[in-house]
Amino acid sequence: MSIITDVYAREVLDSRGNPTLEVEVYTESGAFGRGMVPSGASTGEHEAVELRDGDKSRYGGLGTQKAVDNVNNVIAEAIIGYDVRDQQAIDRAMIALDGTPNKGKLGANAILGVSIAVARAAADYLEIPLYSYLGGFNTKVLPTPMMNIINGGSHSDAPIAFQEFMILPVGAPTFKEALRYGAEIFHALKKILKSRGLETAVGDEGGFAPRFEGTEDGVETIIAAIEAAGYVPGKDVFIGFDCASSEFYDKERKVYDYTKFEGEGAAVRTAAEQIDYLEELVNKYPIITIEDGMDENDWDGWKALTERLGKKVQLVGDDFFVTNTDYLSRGIKEGCANSILIKVNQIGTLTETFDAIEMAKEAGYTAVVSHRSGETEDSTIADIAVATNAGQIKTGSLSRTDRIAKYNQLLRIEDQLGEVAQYKGLQAFYNLKK
């Protein structure tokens, strides 16, 4: 009764109006699962391949009909007949069917859509929530949210190099209250921006994209918003960055060129100067997490940054690790970073995603489950964050339904877990000396 009888993919749109995949999996019992695939704007060069059509006459070349065809005509034939509960076997079968190291033949987007839909169908068959199916009886930790309330870099037209300025409501007693803290700060920030005559339009991830005078101006404005909402910076709420440094790293000159986003007169920093600058910001402001502070291929820079700041700040590898256990394993051995960002479409299956989270935890690294800038209404990452007791999630600002869908799902999960639910707050940063 739990045998897969049909697999079907279609092309749908993501939050940027670009095509992506939606996959449906059906079983003999009538149990059903649907998965939608996100897409990134700033992508690591080592990520699994997102298969696009390349036909400029259709969606500017971004169509996904090739990936849709691969699901409907190749993957479906291979996995029909499998027990929908055998997630690992199905994921491994798709990896083998693709046969490339980066899923470039079938497309990570095709494979991931099926992987998510299979898990949802299995949960539906067992009549249990997705987080319970994926995580088992010990599922209980609601994640501390990283709320991206200022968008810069490749996610907006704002003249700021850093891609994300985030707030983390670590002092809240529950996830529900953490969400309230964030929403109140978001609205306080909007009032401050309006009072300064700055833009309040939002970027890809729902954060504001104003023309600040620089990084420090952005941070100080966020601190003012935290205080205006009635909270204490560095106690109730901390600040985090996603520098997305690979987006402004000049490989030929081996410098971090802030002029790419901030214009003429902006800083151009060596790796050592980049580390000095990040340390300066950490010493000046209540910053608890920095993502991709160095370029994805700057292993020496990552090691030096970790030696300098790794005991006091969470240093998250996104483009650096691309949710890949090979890169994470090397980072652990070489003492680079102390946390990994988990993006399901960087690696392409739920099985490999869970492998990366497990490896990180075993090494004492934290794991931050994350969205992409091109999202959908699919809320699977909320269930993954709780299923793995990851303790942290990054899923955008307090606007745009594609972001709020994940927060609302976490509210439902917290309600369903009842007294068992735990919100760790600051304890989610278990590898830092507080």
Curated annotation (Swiss-Prot):
<keyword id="KW-0964">Secreted</keyword>
<keyword id="KW-0963">Cytoplasm</keyword>
<feature type="binding site">
    <location>
        <position position="373"/>
    </location>
    <ligand>
        <name>(2R)-2-phosphoglycerate</name>
    </ligand>
</feature>
<dbReference type="GO" id="GO:0004634">
    <property type="term" value="F:phosphopyruvate hydratase activity"/>
</dbReference>
<keyword id="KW-0479">Metal-binding</keyword>
<dbReference type="Pfam" id="PF00113">
    <property type="entry name" value="Enolase_C"/>
</dbReference>
<feature type="binding site">
    <location>
        <position position="242"/>
    </location>
    <ligand>
        <name>Mg(2+)</name>
    </ligand>
</feature>
<dbReference type="InterPro" id="IPR020811">
    <property type="entry name" value="Enolase_N"/>
</dbReference>
<feature type="binding site">
    <location>
        <position position="372"/>
    </location>
    <ligand>
        <name>(2R)-2-phosphoglycerate</name>
    </ligand>
</feature>
<dbReference type="GO" id="GO:0000015">
    <property type="term" value="C:phosphopyruvate hydratase complex"/>
</dbReference>
<keyword id="KW-0456">Lyase</keyword>
<dbReference type="GO" id="GO:0009274">
    <property type="term" value="C:peptidoglycan-based cell wall"/>
</dbReference>
<comment type="pathway">
    <text>Carbohydrate degradation; glycolysis; pyruvate from D-glyceraldehyde 3-phosphate: step 4/5.</text>
</comment>
<dbReference type="GO" id="GO:0000287">
    <property type="term" value="F:magnesium ion binding"/>
</dbReference>
<feature type="active site" description="Proton donor">
    <location>
        <position position="205"/>
    </location>
</feature>
<dbReference type="Pfam" id="PF03952">
    <property type="entry name" value="Enolase_N"/>
</dbReference>
<dbReference type="InterPro" id="IPR036849">
    <property type="entry name" value="Enolase-like_C_sf"/>
</dbReference>
<feature type="binding site">
    <location>
        <position position="394"/>
    </location>
    <ligand>
        <name>(2R)-2-phosphoglycerate</name>
    </ligand>
</feature>
<feature type="binding site">
    <location>
        <position position="343"/>
    </location>
    <ligand>
        <name>(2R)-2-phosphoglycerate</name>
    </ligand>
</feature>
<feature type="binding site">
    <location>
        <position position="318"/>
    </location>
    <ligand>
        <name>Mg(2+)</name>
    </ligand>
</feature>
<dbReference type="InterPro" id="IPR029017">
    <property type="entry name" value="Enolase-like_N"/>
</dbReference>
<dbReference type="InterPro" id="IPR000941">
    <property type="entry name" value="Enolase"/>
</dbReference>
<feature type="binding site">
    <location>
        <position position="291"/>
    </location>
    <ligand>
        <name>Mg(2+)</name>
    </ligand>
</feature>
<feature type="binding site">
    <location>
        <position position="163"/>
    </location>
    <ligand>
        <name>(2R)-2-phosphoglycerate</name>
    </ligand>
</feature>
<dbReference type="GO" id="GO:0005576">
    <property type="term" value="C:extracellular region"/>
</dbReference>
<keyword id="KW-0460">Magnesium</keyword>
<dbReference type="InterPro" id="IPR020809">
    <property type="entry name" value="Enolase_CS"/>
</dbReference>
<comment type="similarity">
    <text>Belongs to the enolase family.</text>
</comment>
<feature type="active site" description="Proton acceptor">
    <location>
        <position position="343"/>
    </location>
</feature>
<dbReference type="GO" id="GO:0006096">
    <property type="term" value="P:glycolytic process"/>
</dbReference>
<dbReference type="GO" id="GO:0009986">
    <property type="term" value="C:cell surface"/>
</dbReference>
<protein>
    <recommendedName>
        <fullName>Enolase</fullName>
        <ecNumber>4.2.1.11</ecNumber>
    </recommendedName>
</protein>
<dbReference type="InterPro" id="IPR020810">
    <property type="entry name" value="Enolase_C"/>
</dbReference>
<keyword id="KW-0324">Glycolysis</keyword>
<comment type="function">
    <text>Catalyzes the reversible conversion of 2-phosphoglycerate (2-PG) into phosphoenolpyruvate (PEP). It is essential for the degradation of carbohydrates via glycolysis.</text>
</comment>
